[in-house]
């Protein structure tokens, strides 16, 4: 990959901490090269308390836009001039578009999830979903799924720091969408079993099973799986978690978070450039 930077080259970037591990620079720079777009994408390690200064600098310099990873997704919404419906409901964003100094916040994680599910040949519109977790990734999935037309979503989470915030988001979704959303305490396995039995899709939106803890799974009773269930895990390291392996053994179709990552990036890319990311090329080079 080569990049010839001139005085006209536009700036795209990633803000967060840490960011050195991110595949976003390779992915977006490759897409710009393939399409002949004069942008460069860089990663900047910015802690949460420095986000306001970083945003002011990027606004002043005329950066076209940026992605935000942890820990800046919540504060970035407050720094934006406008917010998308999904970002307003969740209170978080992962993408900023700068239009002549006016910053608009978007959330593309949920968009990436919905596209990844569709690419697996699974239709969940008008269906029921069981969602495990209420952190950042799970919330983005919850909000976008409700906005896009999933009929019913049961969210299961332990009573941790995310539970109160999840209650507020669930209330907003029940008021503003036609989706029926219910928040449950994870401690009741029979309620979980009943929900999964009625669901077209089960989503693990937690980090349980992520490397190096690959022997862990959030569903310890595999009799909850059924052959008509699509099981999706937001984790992509490992690509097949214990949850997905055991679901597949039970006859379920499965998918991981790798293409969710790709498609959220593609959604951000289109917001900045107006162009479709060449996802097949990006898949082959960075996601195979």
Residue ranges of each PLM-predicted region?
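Rossmann-like adenosine-cofactor binding region
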Residues: 179-254
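Glycine-rich adenosine-cofactor-binding loop
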Residues: 16, 105-107, 126-147, 157
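Adenosine-phosphate binding glycine-rich loop
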Residues: 228-230, 234-288
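Short helix-loop-beta connector
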Residues: 99, 122-128, 225-227
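Phosphate/diphosphate ligand-binding glycine-rich loop within oxidoreductases
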Residues: 3-120
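NAD(P)-binding Rossmann-fold cofactor-contacting core
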Residues: 148-177
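Residues at the starts of beta-strands that form the adenosine-phosphate
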Residues: 11, 40, 128, 151-154, ...
């Amino acid at each position: 990959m080569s990049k010839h930077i001139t005085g006209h080259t536009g700036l795209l970037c990633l803000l967060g901490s840490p960011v050195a591990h991110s595949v976003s620079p390779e992915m977006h720079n490759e897409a710009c090269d393939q399409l002949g777009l004069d942008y460069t994408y860089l990663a900047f390690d910015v802690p949460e308390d420095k986000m306001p200064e970083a945003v002011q600098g990027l606004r002043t310099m005329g950066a076209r836009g940026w992605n935000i990873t942890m820990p800046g997704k919540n504060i970035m919404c407050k720094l934006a001039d406008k917010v998308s419906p999904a970002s307003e409901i969740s209170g978080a964003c992962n993408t900023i578009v700068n239009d002549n100094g006016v910053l608009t916040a978007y959330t593309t994680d949920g968009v990436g999830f919905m596209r990844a599910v569709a690419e697996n040949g699974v239709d969940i519109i008008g269906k029921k979903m069981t969602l495990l977790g209420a952190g950042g990734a799970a919330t983005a999935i919850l909000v976008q799924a409700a906005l896009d037309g999933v009929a019913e979503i049961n969210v299961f989470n332990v009573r941790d720091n995310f539970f109160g915030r999840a209650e507020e988001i669930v209330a907003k979704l029940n008021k503003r969408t036609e989706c029926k959303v219910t928040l449950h305490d994870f401690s009741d396995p029979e309620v979980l079993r009943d929900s999964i039995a009625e669901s077209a899709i089960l989503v693990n939106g937690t980090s349980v099973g992520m490397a190096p803890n690959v022997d862990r799974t959030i569903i310890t009773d595999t009799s909850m799986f059924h052959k008509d269930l699509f099981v999706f895990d937001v984790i992509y390291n490992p690509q097949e978690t214990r949850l997905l392996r055991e679901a597949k053994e039970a006859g379920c179709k499965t998918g991981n978070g790798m293409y969710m990552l790709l498609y959220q990036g593609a959604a951000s890319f289109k917001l900045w450039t107006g162009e479709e990311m060449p996802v097949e090329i990006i898949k082959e080079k960075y996601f195979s």
